[in-house]
Structure formats: structure tokens, C-alpha cells
């Protein structure tokens, strides 16, 4: 893996409040749709995906999933498939920040890409899913993700927007966790205070500013007081902030906020 290009002093020079809010559309809560798993297709691999061996050290894991005919494609520099959007820079930059500001001692030598249907995923407590709006799960993926969450795993869903993509995500998790419903998360939720004190949930999306960002979660036993198993950064893309945080595309304070959300997710999940 290439070395991180994040300039830590610049990124954390001003861990302050967000800039003023952004014009946005109201979010509608679409009804569920039936998931129709499709046959697995060969993974699109425009680049190498080196991995690191499991040794018990916290390692950033990205989920590679079956996109089938529903793939929306990424907007990253290499136009990776949706599940690889912002890879590898977002992953590398985030893990360097996590190492810098916490005592977790994460693996800074590399990150992993693991198939959604691979039981190896169970070795890692937290996994990141990019563009789940284009996920067309196989039965093996549905079963493995259900087992992963049931055993204590935590999923971060990022980089998706629109009612169409939300309907796909909601339908997938209606199958993975029947009887569970996503609920809108408020600022007072423990996950937003697990390490950094998040001051606002109005983190403007780096792209598609016409959408209003919203955070939603799935809780164990569908109990709002229970363990949060899945968090969805709906109508947002914190991975994009991570990827371009050293290139001047976005204001430093917004990149800082995106990192704070990610760090909080990890610390929350590692302590529940």
C-alpha cells in the first residue's frame, strides 16, 4: 500500500464547528421493496487490492459486494466500482488519522477488502460499505452479513443518495434483519459522543448538494436503546472527504468533521 498523503497538522489545525448549513431537499422514507438476489458476477478489479494478514490488530475493512445490473459506478479517480469508491486513499488516510488521535493502535501497514459473502469478514469488528445503493446481494452475502451482525459486527454504509438507492438498502436489511427498521439518529445518540463531541449532524455532502444528509441506524432487537449494528450516512459521502482531504478540494473544517464522524463510529463499535 502506498503511504498516506494526509498532512496531519493541516487536517487537525481547526477541529471546529461546521460551516453554515446547505440548501437541501426533504428526505422521504420510501416503502420496502423485495430483494431479488442475482447470480454473482466476476468482480470488477481495475487495480490490485492488497490485503494484510489477521493478527488481532484493528484493521480497516472495506466490503466488496455483488453489484449485478444495479451498479451505479463510482466517481473516484480510477472510476472504481461503487464498492471501491475512494479506495485506497480514503481507507489509508482514515486509518492514519485514527492512529494519530486515538490509542487504538490500528494496523497502519495496510487495509483489507473482503467479500460480503466471505466468513473471513467475521474476524473484523467493523466494516465499511461504499455505495450500497447499487448492492444486488446474493443469498450467500445476505446470510453472511446477517451472521456477521448477529455476532457483534458493525457496518458503516456510506456514499448513497436518493429514494431509489435508499429503497434498495432498506430492502436488503429487511431481509438481513427481519423485524428491524432504520430509525433517524439524533445528535444526542451515544455514537456521536463516543470520542469527539459532534456539534451538528448537518455535514454538507461533498457532492450532490441537492440532497439533505441524514444519519440512520439499525439497533439490536430493534431496540433504540440497544447496540447500534448499522449506521447509514444517507445522502452523504464521508469517504469522499477522507479521500481528498489533502488536496484542497473541500474546506479543511469539513474534512475534519468527516474524520470525527469516522473516529466516533470506530470507538463506539469497539466499546459496545
Question: Which residue ranges define each predicted feature?
Answer:
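An acidic, glycine-rich "communication" segment
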Residues: 41-42, 72-74, 162-244, 258-259, ...
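Aromatic-Pro/Gly-enriched surface loop or interdomain linker
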Residues: 27-126, 132-133, 237-272
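Surface-exposed patches in mature extracellular/periplasmic domains of secreted proteins
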Residues: 104-114, 157-161, 180-188
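Short alpha-beta junction capping motif
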Residues: 60, 126-166
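Bacterial N-terminal signal peptides that target proteins for export
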Residues: 1-17
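Hydrophobic alpha-helical membrane-insertion segments, chiefly the h-region
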Residues: 16-28
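Active-site-proximal beta-strand/loop segments in catalytic clefts of secreted hydrolases
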Residues: 63-66, 129-132, 151, 158-160, ...
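Extracytoplasmic/secreted envelope proteins and their assembly/folding machinery
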Residues: 91-95, 142, 146, 166-170, ...
